């Protein structure tokens, strides 16, 4: 196991009927900005309920944060905050709203252009650059990204998606109420299942380093998502199923399962380029890329793939290579069973998409991806070709 530091200060408030706790979690004298996405949070009455729970605090609202949030939207929110004197932000929605809010709270206390903060986001925005971002909390309505309990964001600018990290943008608290997910469109639920699943495989399907606890955590999340995947789509108001989905999504990317073990992330980074170029949903791009990547990188990941086959899919017969092949096939079948196609051609994309994405990877400096830095543009081309 590798050396690691694990730090996560986010207070999780889990379960139904918890909005009244906002009155104790948000400072009494705060001037609050509620950030949210489309109109569903307003139409459902959730925003009104949150405003009521905030009591006598001054509350402003900033809506319209889009899926795959753009730098331009974040810039408008920062200008709004500086104009109105906001000092606490409450993100209401899914990962896109929370990701945008992380950049917004940094930009709100930075003297220069917000784009400078975004471009300083890897490996991490320097503390001296933004030493005091505004505090923020979240009320989650979509289980998927894990952004409610981590310090990362992904922002869209031009034809690229930019990761942004800072040790100072963990949410102060996150409210996870499974009942707030009951009215989600089916497509978003499917995407959330796949996102949670692939967040986990990115930190698990690499190579062994005797991270036994981390492996068991990951296997538990994967097995749970396989067990509940179809049911959480088909029975949206099953509280216990949605509760497990929501908690699994948070645990998949709060730093715990990746502590002390190698991490891949090539599937996500290639997927980000597909989203930026063709506006495919993030979950769809992961379903396309992961099985193809596992096929191409099978030899390098063989030991963990065989372990995955045995422990997660209960495949016990055959050589390690045979087990790996069966596990990869099972993974593809799982995504397809949710009604999510796993080939580029299913979305009207062919060889020209392969060329475009490889060029974007090169243009954005994504030339040494994967846990060993050996997913070069040539390997990415092989993966995308396999995904056709």
Regions found by a protein language model. Give the residues of each.
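ATP/NTP phosphate-donor binding region
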Residues: 1-88, 344-345
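A glycine/threonine-rich phosphate-anchoring loop and its flanking beta-alpha core
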Residues: 10, 110-210, 307
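Short glycine/serine/threonine-rich phosphate/pyrophosphate-binding segments
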Residues: 19-22, 42-46, 71-72, 96-101, ...
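Short Gly/Thr/Asp-enriched flexible loops that form oxyanion-binding sites at enzyme active sites
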Residues: 77-78, 97-111, 149-150
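Glycine/serine-rich anion-binding loops at beta->alpha junctions
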Residues: 86-102, 141-147, 277-280
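Active-site segments that bind and position negatively charged phosphate/pyrophosphate groups
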Residues: 203, 207-330
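C-terminal charged capping/lid subdomain of soluble metabolic enzymes
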Residues: 305, 316-388
